[in-house]
Amino acid sequence: PDSVRLRDYSPINVEAGRKLIAERGLQDTVTFDEVNAYDRTNYQDLQPRPTLGIVSGLHELFADNDLILNSLYGFGDAIETGGYLIYTGQPWHPQLEMIARALTSHKAGSPNWVMRRRSQREMDQLVEKAGFEKIRQWIDEYGIFTVSLAVKK
């Protein structure tokens, strides 16, 4: 690729990612920035414009579909027509309670969080609302994890 842009809200993750980029000598191609993925303005005026966006594990963190749409609209604003969005889903999980107690970093350490499950249909509708058309989906043998590919209309 000509360029790769990585983004995360956690300064710890960004610092670790930048270290790996430097260790591998990829600074001329790869950048890693600390941003809020749910703020649509963080997707504006990206240069070069992305032709591919990947969002993984982000949309399960919060129940509010408006936050999810802000993220997806941002991808829709940024990605060129004919470009692609790869997104993940978790329609269900047998260990929701354990995950909720173990993964608390995004909720200021609060144990009072449970992953927001969205049906595949709901997730696909949100992606479509943001200007993409789903063209392919893969799912694991247990029906827990999905990966979908959509094209920008």
Predicted segment positions?
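A short glycine-rich, Lys/Arg-flanked "PGG" loop and its adjoining helix->strand segment in the class I
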Residues: 68-81
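Conserved beta-strand signature within the Rossmann-like core of class I S-adenosyl-L-methionine
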Residues: 81-90
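Conserved Class I S-adenosyl-L-methionine
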Residues: 98-125
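A short SAM/SAH-binding and catalytic strip from SAM-dependent methyltransferases
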Residues: 50-66
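Core SAM-dependent methyltransferase catalytic element
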Residues: 130-153
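Helix-to-beta-strand junctions that scaffold the AdoMet/dcAdoMet cofactor pocket
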Residues: 26, 62-63, 79-81
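Class I SAM-dependent methyltransferase SAM/SAH-binding core
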Residues: 1-39
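A short acidic, Gly/Pro-enriched loop at the edge of an enzyme's catalytic core
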Residues: 38, 42-53
